[in-house]
UniProtKB/Swiss-Prot annotation:
NCBIfam families in the record: 1-(5-phosphoribosyl)-5-[(5-phosphoribosylamino)methylideneamino]imidazole-4-carboxamide isomerase, PRK13585.1
Uppermost EC category: isomerase
Family: Belongs to the HisA/HisF family.
CDD domains: HisA
GO cellular component terms attached to this protein's record: cytoplasm
GO molecular function, one term: 1-(5-phosphoribosyl)-5-[(5-phosphoribosylamino)methylideneamino]imidazole-4-carboxamide isomerase activity
Database matches in PANTHER family: 1-(5-PHOSPHORIBOSYL)-5-[(5-PHOSPHORIBOSYLAMINO)METHYLIDENEAMINO] IMIDAZOLE-4-CARBOXAMIDE ISOMERASE
Protein known as: 1-(5-phosphoribosyl)-5-[(5-phosphoribosylamino)methylideneamino] imidazole-4-carboxamide isomerase
Species, as recorded: Rhodopseudomonas palustris (strain TIE-1)
Amino acid sequence: MILFPAIDLKNGQCVRLEQGDMARATVFNLDPAAQAQSFAAQGFQYLHVVDLDGAFAGKPMNAQAVEAMLKVVSMPVQLGGGIRDLKTIEAWLSKGIARVIIGTAAVRDPALVKEAAKAFPGRVAVGLDARDGNVAVEGWAESSQVTALDIAQRFEDAGVAAIIFTDIARDGLLKGINWDATIALAEAISIPVIASGGLASIEDVRTLLSPRAKKLEGAIAGRALYDGRLDPTEALALIGAAKAA
């Protein structure tokens, strides 16, 4: 079970949004590389990074900040935002990104996901961000007419490493993860699922470690870590104890 600390990038800074709204961004660190180092020092094992500007632009927009992070941490980094063609995927993987996350392109160009997953086994994940059950695209600015399960099932045999499922309504609001929807998705497919959006407290970590959530690979923690509502030492100790049991 992995707890991924999140770094969302906007204008080269580390921010958190509320419900994916770029107008509701709070800057938490002017130096994303320093934030990445802080997470590494706290004992986290895997970093989750999103290029928010890239998600809206459809191409990488915070490459300098991402590359700076890669230089200062040794833990694996998964990256999403603006990754919509094979050339961009190849470029990021060659620079040291452990796993790329394809979001909008997974809805609009599923063949890209299948091609990339075949070319780079274990290094391609799909990000499914749902609003009222349907997947949103273009940095969450547009809603599609397909459900997360519809999309996920397209990639059952494609070799996708993970599905990162976000409930947009809860993202950045500290209301707790939508466990019902996330676990239902995980139980309906064979691809590992990572929970995202709304992780609020140590109680969410306990749920993550419960038998109910046994099909989940992990969860992403954002605002709760920055606000101090989730103590990283306590959370990682809980996960460590569960692994040792």
